[in-house]
């Protein structure tokens, strides 16, 4: 109703499943989905791909969280080899994961903002991607 009244231009959804998105699409065009997703929490892998096929933006929340100590050490090793920070590598992985991923990382200072922006310039080579893709599900257990 709000969209029909001109009060809302576009509809985005958060914390939704494929089924819920399909249900919403029967009523309105969906332009963006925001769910938890990052280099180690990839439960939405198939959803990211589906949305990319449909031209729908995906905004991951918690893009830098959830690392175990083992994952963190492996992530840091990749970062060190690239002359980057671990967080830059994690953001770069998301940006390289799919063209429909849009990042809104938090920042606490101008220096932090510059570090976040530098992640967009970081190109992860195949060997780094291979290492990073093994982080999912790895823990100390």
Residue ranges and their predicted role:
Residues 1-141:
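Beta/alpha (TIM)-barrel catalytic core signal, keyed to glycine-rich beta->alpha loops juxtaposed to Asp/Glu
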């Amino acid at each position: 109703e709000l969209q029909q009244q001109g009060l809302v231009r576009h509809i985005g959804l958060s914390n939704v499943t494929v089924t819920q998105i399909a249900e919403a699409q029967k009523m309105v065009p969906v332009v963006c989905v925001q769910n938890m997703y990052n280099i180690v929490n990839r439960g939405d892998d198939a959803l990211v791909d589906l949305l990319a096929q449909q031209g729908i933006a995906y905004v991951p929340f918690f893009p830098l969280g959830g690392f175990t100590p083992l994952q963190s050490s492996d992530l840091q090793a990749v970062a060190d080899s690239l002359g980057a920070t671990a967080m830059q590598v994690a953001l770069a992985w998301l940006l390289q994961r799919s063209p429909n991923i849009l990042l809104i990382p938090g920042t606490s200072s101008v220096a932090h903002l510059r570090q976040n922006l530098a992640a967009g310039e970081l190109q992860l080579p195949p060997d780094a991607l291979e290492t990073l893709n093994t982080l999912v599900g790895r823990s100390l257990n």
